[in-house]
Amino acid sequence: MIKLVCCGKMRMKWMKEGVQEYTSRIQPYDKIQIIEVQDEKAPENNSASDDEKVKQIEGQRMLAQIRQEEYVILLDLKGKTCDSVQLSKTIQDLYTYSHNKITFVIGGSLGVSQELIQRANMRWKISDNTFPHQLCRVIVLEQIYRAFRIM
């Protein structure tokens, strides 16, 4: 089973349609679940301390959606990059040898808490470019679909 745990709701119609499109393409290969946790509003003129509080709250909400037996792939700017073939091999190896529940985590706009980073089994940097977090959902789903097609 594939699960996406995401911070915040999808707001733009075309992105929602992209998520729906790739979700329906993935379903013949495996079950997929998308969980949206509420994002925390950052105060005006937020300090580094305020940012950490927001990341902590959002991190707790996301961690509450992750079970012990799940293999967690965290989207992280400090993660390692892997191309579509490498991602496909990673997913295939997980399914074959160890885990049948893979959870992709997409944090909020301020990043993720240290606890979430520590829980991650793998940290994945999808690109050197910066994307809106909502667009990352579409990109991740497309890459998961592509990974299944490559297998």
Name each model feature, range by range.
Residues 110, 114-151:
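Structured adenosyl-cofactor binding patch, chiefly the S-adenosyl-L-methionine
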Residues 31-33, 122:
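Conserved beta-strand segments of alpha/beta enzyme cores
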Residues 5, 33-35:
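General small-molecule cofactor/ligand-binding pocket signal
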Residues 1-26:
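N-terminal beta1-alpha1 ligand-phosphate binding loop
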Residues 31, 38-100:
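S-adenosyl-L-methionine/SAH cofactor-binding core of RNA-modifying enzymes
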Residues 1, 100-104:
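Loop/turn-to-beta-strand initiation segments
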Residues 10, 77-80, 108-111:
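Short glycine-rich anion-binding loops that position phosphate/pyrophosphate groups of nucleotides
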Residues 4, 73, 107, 140:
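Conserved RecA-like P-loop NTPase ATPase core
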